[in-house]
Amino acid sequence: MIGLVRRLALLLLLAASAAAAQDEAVLLVAHPAFRDLEYRQTVLIAAPAPNGGHVGVILNRPTRRSLASLFPDHAPSKKVIDPVYYGGPFSRAALVALVHADHAPGDGAVPIMKDLYLAFRANTIDHVIESTPNEARYYVGYVGWRPGELRGEIDRGLWTVMDADLSFVFRKDTEGMWEELLQASRRIRAESSGSEPEPLRLRLAAVRALTPNFAVAR
């Protein structure tokens, strides 16, 4: 039975390519040789942006600051439990938010995937903090790609592309996330025996099937 599950998982992952990263949200796992300090050992979520490029944030760089420490005079910020995360090198002084909601939380929010939006505008983020503060994760800065730029980075082998998953976006403990996903991707590549298309998109369903102890708990 396990062998059958593995074969089915491999068929699933071999049917998909990194070209899908152009059309929907994905997780990006930095290659070990990616030495840029901004992205070394990072996991990102990225999705198409209205300008034809892509936009996203780094998921595994928590800071030591709380939202309340950044906005001490803003009482609703004290309700936010999680730390503020470092989202990327674009607009480092700006606050953005990944918001878990079944509809757009306000003006200018970019849909990332089902029930997930990236909010940029201050009035939208204020509304989220005041109404559903712990249904979001807050970041200083973000990552942006020009049209075609992300595909170029994937083709150069800078990223392993995996299915986006809300359980990673809002995972409480992000320490070890990069190593976990990297090891899982290597295990899948080993199972595929060199028959995968290049570049390969690895589906989390296949990762879970091949890795019994793979953790995605929040």
Across the structure, where does each feature detected by a protein language model lie?
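Sec-dependent signal peptide recognition
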Residues: 3-11
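Hydrophobic h-region of N-terminal signal peptides that target proteins for export
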Residues: 11-20
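A short aromatic-anchored loop/beta-hairpin motif
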Residues: 20-210, 214-218
